[in-house]
Each structure stands twice: as structure tokens, then as C-alpha cells.
A protein has these predicted regions:
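Structural/interface elements that position substrates and couple domains in central-metabolism enzymes
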Residues: 1-175
Length: 175
């Protein structure tokens, strides 16, 4: 299933190598170029939404990021879009939760063992990895625990209709 761009292992590197070989041999590989461009767009999507809808009105929001692994069911953060996002917001109050990523690998932000503690009093919630436990978040409780009302959920982990009914500003990737 689609993620926030090509991440993890070596696929991104391999595609760039194939593209370089194709360019050296004057072979048109627009398809691979399109994949790489789409990946770049997806990797920056959360950042672009955060800039447009949050940072434009609140220069110092508190932000919860749920998920650092590049995909669910792994502890790998290699080339994870979350790391790029963390680098961009390292001067903000950032709360972080991931069920399996080693907290010692995280350079920025404050790691929380529980989802509830992570989301408490934040202005923005970003779900960067669609872990199963994030689907079980009690949205009414979320409404009471958060200070703000912005949800950035590229994977549609949460129930968008209920979030909107509760007064959240909900952003997801695609339609």
C-alpha cells in the first residue's frame, strides 16, 4: 500500500542508479522519474500541510508525531519521512510515539511510551506510520486531550467523518 514516499532499504537508491544508467545510454525512463518525483512530493506532504495550515498562524505549535518507522511492522527508520519532518521542526515542542522504534535513535523531540501522554496538550497530531494501535485511538478522548484541533493523517488511520463532526481540521493525502 502507498506510503509517504519511497523509504527504507535500498529501493530509492536502486531507482536512482537505474535512472543514471538510462541517462548515460540516452534511454527515456520517464516512469522512474515520475516515481521519484511522486516520492519527493509524498515525503514532504506532511511538512507542506503543517506549514500551510498551522505554522502560518501559530509559529510555535506543540506537535505530536505518531510513528517514526518508515512503514508499520518494522523498527527501521532508514530514510523515514518522519526524520525529515523532525529535522524541519526540531525547534518546536515535539512529542513522539512509536511502538517499536528505539527511542535512543531519535535526535529531536520528546519520546512518550504511551499514546495518551504523547497527544496530551498538543496543538497538532500527525500520524506518520499507520500502526494498528493508532486506529484504536478514542476520538472523543482525543478531542478532550488536545489543545488544538489539527489532524494530519495521510493514511486515513482515523475516522475522518467523526473527527470533522468533533470540530477537528482533518487533512489526508489524496481525496
Amino acid at each position: 500500500k502507498p506510503g509517504l514516499g519511497i523509504s527504507g532499504g535500498n529501493l530509492e537508491r536502486d531507482l536512482k542508479t537505474i535512472l543514471k544508467i538510462a541517462n548515460n545510454k540516452n534511454i527515456n525512463f520517464d516512469l522512474i522519474t515520475s516515481w521519484i518525483d511522486n516520492s519527493k512530493f509524498r515525503k514532504k506532504w506532511c511538512w507542506e500541510i503543517l506549514k500551510k495550515f498551522v505554522l502560518s498562524v501559530n509559529k510555535n505549535p506543540s506537535i505530536a508525531i505518531l510513528g517514526l518507522a518508515y512503514k508499520e511492522n518494522t523498527n527501521s527508520i532508514k530514510n523515514s519521512p518522519s526524520l525529515d519532518l523532525l529535522e524541519r521542526i526540531k525547534d518546536k515542542a515535539v512529542h513522539i510515539h512509536d511502538p517499536v522504534v528505539d527511542p535512543n535513535k531519535i535526535k529531536y523531540g520528546t519520546y512518550f511510551k504511551s499514546i495518551d501522554e504523547c497527544i496530551r496538550n498538543v496543538d497538532v497530531l500527525i500520524i506518520s506510520t499507520p500502526w494498528e494501535e493508532y486506529k484504536k485511538i478514542d476520538l472523543n478522548k482525543l478531542k478532550n486531550e488536545m489543545n488544538g484541533n489539527v489532524i494530519i493523517d495521510p493514511f486515513r488511520v482515523l475516522n475522518s467523518n467523526l473527527l470533522i463532526d468533533l470540530g477537528f481540521q482533518y487533512h489526508t493525502l489524496g481525496i
